[in-house]
Amino acid sequence: MHKRNGPQAPPGRGAVTARQLGLLVDFSPDGLMIPEDGINEEELEAEFLALVGGQPQALEKLKGQGPLPMEAIEKMARLCMRDLDEDEEGTDEDDVEADEDLLAELNEVLGEEQKAVEPLMPVAQPKPSGPNPGVEATLQERLTLYQSALESARQAGDSAKMRRYDRGLKTLENLLVSAKKGNIINEADIPPPVASGKGAAAGHSHTQATSQLASVSPPAPESSGTLEAPSTTTPTSAKPQLPPDPCSPLARLQSLQHEYKLAALRAKHQDDTATATRHLRIAKSFDPVLEALSRGELVDLSRLPPPPDQLSPEPPLPAAQPLTSASTLTRPEVPQPPRNLLEALEQRMERYHVAAAQAKAKGDQRKARMHERIVKQYQDAIRAHKAGRAVDVAELPVPPGFPPMQGLESAEPSQQSLVGVLETAMRLANHDEGSDDEEEETPKKQNTPAASTTQLKSSPSKAPPSGPAPAGKAAPKGTSNRAQQQLAFLEGRKKQLLQAALRAKQKNDVEGAKMHLRQAKGLEPMLEASRNGLPVDIAKVPPAPVNKDDFVLVQRPGPGLSQEAVRRYGELTKLLRQQHEMCLNHSTQFTHLGNIAETIKFEKLAEDCKRSMDTLKQAFARSLPTPAARFEQRTFSVIKVFPDLSNSDMLLFIVKGINLPTPTGLSPSDLDAFVRFDFPYPNVEEAQKDKTSVIKNTDSPEFKEQFKLCINRGHRGFRRAIQTKGIKFEVVHKGGLFKTDRVLGTAQLKLGTLETACEVHEILEVLDGRRPTGGRLEVMVRIREPLTAQQLETTTERWLVIDHIPAAMPTVTGPKAKAPLIPASSREAGNRSARPLHSLSVLAFDQERLERKILALRQARRPVPPEVAQQYQDVVQRSQWQRAQLEQGGAALRREYASHLERQLHFYTEAARRLGYDGSREAAKEALYRRNLVESELQRLRR
């Protein structure tokens, strides 16, 4: 240790030195008193007065007094913290806005009136400007200024300025890097210019920076009445900044505002409250314009109020307003209505192409990529449209200012493919059943919030429009349109709710009727929005009401039914009820997901189940044999979920062990095994543990036990546990008397699959350390639903289908199927009404099919069912009778027969489309084959 040479400092001298350096501050009242020994010397006093700009009165008052008042301390602190450069930049008069005494005095005069004062000069909202080429030069200039100022402050030993300049220097460096990358720099984020502390050099640098900033945006002519402030002028802030040019519009406005504030103060001293209020309002109205000038916007100075001494007694004109012509010019114009779908697609693609180019020019790469993806979608849609394929315009984004394209997708003739024929048949089948003649349907108008678009007529002939469509009906009928599916779903749900309200009223359930009626009324805003082409959130639609009596055979069977028939009715009812419940569950799940297509699909299946149940009820009430029923293979896309579990439950199933290892000296038949598990959640110390019961005397025990574990789906620890740890299992041999349990092996179940699946079912290998033992352990884990996404899976079900109408005699539900003109002498005595006409080709097909079925039964030496024999007889009799009638009826009956064939063609077309949509591929193929038979017969008849 080296000894310090020289005299030792007196005790306490270090603390004094620390206080002088500002390291120790004494906030006690004694420490705030000015001591008289050496501190108030004339030299120090003169130096202090020179620093603060000469305030001798305040100091003389403080001499010899006690603790200083807080106002004086704060004022001295402000004076000490100010820079000399700031004193040179501004004057006392320019700080009128910060004069708290003046503002307090004016507020005291005006009272509550100032709260209602609104700016007289409305300013347009600023628009973000693109990247300015002068910003980078400005940042470089400011960077040089801050580096010079930092060096001057370091030489002067001013630590406060050094820290402030260092922060500004780092900010400028970051902004400069961002500007070089092409990003947009907010001018308000640029630190203000500072004086470098080098006299003329600072002034020269400031002048050069100001000229550089002024050259960023070209000034407008003085005669036009519009001036532009420098683009880098920042809003008023507490940081030191350069004063505006005396000839600039900003300085002109600030001077005028200052004059009005002084005039308001003078009027207040003269007790002229009205004039003071008026002048203060005018002064306040300058604030928005000053902000607009600070942001670099164009401002109209032609309507500035005159100086206060020239102000007329009338109310002043509104002050200058920022020009909004630029924003008006850049607003996208509404395009001309397209003539067809191709033109509409090209218009919208061009709009997004322009938007992508603008985003690239502004440096917004994210928005540019988004617009380019939309352009790619439109290009694919245009190629598909030119190739003759259908385009789902509801899936394409619509740019702002463009009306939706609903109604244009079918405005051009396309190839008559099978899909097009089916869709046309669907529209024709939806005609009004009360009209006998084939009237032409007039086009209906679709109301949209932006513009109204036209829609294709349902009839191929062109008829003049008779008027707008009623508000209650939807105009477009495009079956591929998501909006139409949405509208059909909402109308069907409203009808179900109204029917439920009526049933509740009939049962004297007033509260239930009111509830269903309120729910139906609540769907009207959604219906109106859907009719206007707007999307709605179907997840907010109330669920379909369920009537338990729909699937109950309430009538007693007639005397003609046997016990076997009653049992058969009960089985069919149970199957239909299960199918209906499954359809409602899947429909609710897809409704919450917003999948309108799958929701409508299961809604239709549920309606089919109800119609089948109605057929059963009618046959049961009449004591008829059970209707013809069959099972079909239906394939569905369903959401796999375990509704009996809550979100905080996880079920662990330990099913069985397979060839578990046995200890040395024991045979497999002597193994007494059980399994214990360890799930480290919520943490390792509080892990959830349990074990199975002991299964004795086998090496392949079947445990079949389940354990409910508690989880928190959103907890971070749970995600970490399933991703990295899982569940650990130990296969243990139960020890006997004075023998401990022996661990035979371990197994680990990974739970990462639960992210996308709600069930994990695996057969794990039992290991002894890392060595396989040859044993297996079957386990399974279930949660309510996957952690991150819904699990969609395809399932095939045996679907019960009850024939509402025999396949050999399809009743045509068309517009008023008239009875054929049959002479009275040709009618059978027992036939009180004329039989409907059917296609002879279809009857021949049904007869041939029934003959093959009967022949197969006889070859198998099985009895022919009575209903099959009855169907065969009906087909043969109908075919013979209809051929005779067509030969005797003449031209009138042939025309009627042709009309019936057209109706049957439409019926089979719609049936094939509906069955194909529901997933019944075999039934759809049969309906399509019948349709082709009818079409061929109709062509032969017309020739």
UniProtKB/Swiss-Prot annotation:
Positions where Phosphoserine occurs in the chain: 248, 435
Source taxon at top rank: Eukaryota
Bias kind Pro residues: ranges: 304-319
Domain C2: 630-764
Database matches in SUPFAM superfamilies: C2 domain (Calcium/lipid-binding domain, CaLB)
One annotated Gene Ontology cellular component of this protein: endosome membrane
PROSITE patterns listed in its UniProt record: C2
Main location: cytoplasm
Name assigned to this protein: Coiled-coil and C2 domain-containing protein 1A
Species this protein is from: Mus musculus (Mouse)
Gene: Cc2d1a
